[in-house]
Amino acid sequence: MDTILKWKSDTDRKKGKRMEPLGVKKKQGSIVEILRDAILHNDIECDTELTQKEIADNLEVSRMPVREALILLEYQGLIRRLPNNHVKVVNFTKGYFAEIFQLGMLLEGKILRQMEKPETMMQQSELSVHREIYRNCHNQLWSKTLESITEIYLEYGIRNIQNQEENKEREEFLHKVLKEAEKKEYAKMEEQLQKYFSCMIHEFEKREI
């Protein structure tokens, strides 16, 4: 499972052409992680139709782990199932990622209002802060929703955005969020949350990460 492959276009797929190599992946990377990254990076384009057999053949694995991966990807909002039991990559329309991150911002703001000593997370990594927030949520539906946003979209963005200046700015906004939450200055906290998530939205909408 070193390589994942792609089609340049749906026309190529219909002509029976094999997917193109996307690049070598670590063997320990799961199928769902490989496919998720390829979709978010736009290596597998929006509206591309996929089958279990095609993916399994190209990744040189059995269909069972592919089937399980596709179930997860559907739950994560990256693919949709078709009547013929194939799947299709969702169409990331303008504002798609903004809506996801705005929901994350809303939920994190509500949870931070309920947390004790949020400033104690200051020494944690950026991703660890987000994980700590959803783990401290007492509403199971909110927690699972925010977990999905964190582990799919935030994790991917934090891992792949290479601009060090932007990374530093984003982390500074997050630290200010925790400081204002600690002081119970919730209006200021939400202002910093807005700035933080706006940075992430901007990067995703460029679709260059």
Which residues make up each language-model segment?
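C-terminal regulatory/oligomerization modules of transcriptional regulators
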Residues: D2-L5, S9, S128-V129, R135-E165, ...
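C-terminal all-alpha effector/ligand-binding and dimerization domain
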Residues: N160-I209
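A generic alpha-helix signature
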Residues: K26, S30, S128, E172, ...
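Short, flexible turn/loop "capping" segments at secondary-structure junctions
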Residues: R80-L82, E126, E169-R170
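Short, hydrophobic secondary-structure boundary micro-motifs
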Residues: C46-T48, L82, W142-L146, M189-E190
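Short linear motifs at protein or domain termini
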Residues: M1-R113, I209
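A short secondary-structure junction motif
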Residues: A38, N42, I152-Y156, E203, ...
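All-alpha effector-binding/dimerization core of bacterial HTH-type transcriptional repressors
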Residues: Q76, V89-Q140, K144-E151, K176-K188
